[in-house]
Amino acid sequence: MARTRPPNPPAPSITATHVESSNIQQTRRGIPITGTLRLRGEATATEESPAERRHIRWAEDVVDNEGQGKKSSKVCCIYHKPREVGESSSESDSSDSDSSESNSDSEIDSGEARMTNSRSPRRHLHNHDHGGSEHSGHGRKRPKTKPKVNAYERVPKYNEKREGTGEGP
């Protein structure tokens, strides 16, 4: 059974007429509209060129969190402020630590040891002996692990149970 839909009625429109002798406008329905709206740009207190006013000015607390010279107000990467070599982080200052040295295994994941500006891997330092091999792998290959998917890339799982809901074919 086919249904036909009546055409959509036209949207109501208003026509404004400007009368030069007064500041009153009238609509098609005869309702007077009074008033004038004047829009002005923001007045600047300092003497700046027009090109300087159009540029984005970042606050001092905004960081370049990707190392590419681009500042952003949204954080898309975890930023770790660079520290001096001997300086410790607040996480490793706990009293239950076995070692008093600052470069422990817990600091490896700080982001500093992962990549340099040239995007090449950097050797990481930690406090255990490798027997002089310096991460050579001792001749064995590690099984390749699947990379972790972050929350933005993960596809949500939906219930495919539709029989009891009345939906579906």
UniProtKB/Swiss-Prot annotation:
InterPro entries in the cross-refs: PPI_Ypi1
Gene Ontology cellular-component terms listed: nucleus
Biased composition (Basic and acidic residues): 50-60, 128-137, 154-169
Major localisation: nucleus
Positions with biased composition (Pro residues): 1-12
GO MF terms held by the record: protein phosphatase 1 binding; protein serine/threonine phosphatase inhibitor activity
Acidic residues composition bias: residue spans: 93-110
Annotated function: Regulator of type 1 phosphatases which maintains protein phosphatase activity under strict control.
Similarity remark: Belongs to the YPI1 family.
Name under which the protein is recorded: Type 1 phosphatases regulator YPI1
Protein species of origin: Coccidioides immitis (strain RS)
